[in-house]
Amino acid sequence: MFEYLLMIFKYMTVKRLLNLFKSYTSYYLSIVLKIPIVWGYPPILMIEPTNICNLKCPLCPSGTGQLKRPKGYMTLDTFKKTIKEVSPYTFMLIMWNQGEPFLNKDFIEMCKIAKQHNMLLLVSTNANLLPSAKEIVAAKIDRLIVSADGASQETYNKYRRNGELSIVVENIDAIIKEKNIAKSKLPKVIWQFIVMKHNEHELEKIKNITDKIGVDQLQLKTVQIYEKEDINKFLPNNPKYRRYKVRGNNFELKYGIKNRCRRIWTQPVINWDGELAVCCFDKDNDFKIGNINEHLFKELWKNKSFYNFRAQILKDRAKIEMCKNCGEGISLKIKSK
């Protein structure tokens, strides 16, 4: 926790700190009064460089081809406009959503622009198609999350279809070696392992692999499922690694759904085409707010459409279909080391 606070502190200005206070104060006040109050602007922003991916993961809307919205890559112009407008109060950028960020040819340049605006940068990748380790280290990414869920190719490929575990290991090993050469502490490399039925037996092996490579952290994560058929196919046998409780052929989140959502007040998403999404669970941008290419971000953040959505969250969040499978407010990560 101390390390995390120290990391955040480096990117704080008086304006950003005041905005952070206003954002969370208005969020908690909204819960108490049950009406949307929005002071300030999002301290955290998720940006989608692309919704295209090189892998075919069976529980991912991009990987399965179930994503309905158009596919494409964010342009540098859209990214620059966004950063120019949000950087005075937004201190953290989460650079992924649906898709592999490094497929965008301008992605490294986007990272450099974000760092020029003194923004904390989080990036998640499947690490199969990376630029050179030198480019990645030079980009000063704060946290590089590597999604790889297996200690053997056979197990890994059951979920990360079309991926090669050996390439992932080789790429991450190269990044860590380049960090040492450059005497850089960044990026902190986090190996993220989604625990599923077919890979829970490899937890000790993956700990050994990540220790040997020298990653900064191994992070275990619970799997998100969508259909009844997924219960027996993907949910691990050990309930410790589940976010759901199962009754017969039905499943539901362990802790229910409360009429609140921190993300809607503090962490929206801008998709590759500039469309503002209320959160990362709105995969197909069903709740229309507006486009950053056509409006100022400040106008979108406090417009009527977003107000009405927040009001519904406070009134009856369970009536919003996408919220029924959202992990907001519950721990999705499992302590590993």
Each PLM stretch: what is its role?
Residues 2-143, 154, 158, 162, ...:
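Conserved alpha-helical substructure of the radical SAM core
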Residues 1-11, 69-70, 74-77, 117-120, ...:
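Radical SAM enzyme [4Fe-4S]-AdoMet core and its adjacent flexible, acidic
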Residues 54-62, 281, 321-330:
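Local cysteine-cluster metal-coordination motifs and their immediate loop/turn environment
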Residues 47, 51-54, 255, 317-320:
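Processing junctions and N-termini across compartments
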Residues 23-42, 291-311:
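Short, charged low-complexity linear segments at domain edges
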Residues 43, 263-264, 319:
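Short, basic and Ser/Thr-rich N-terminal targeting/leader segments
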Residues 51, 259, 277, 321-324:
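Extracellular secreted precursors and ectodomains with disulfide-bonded cysteine-rich loops/domains
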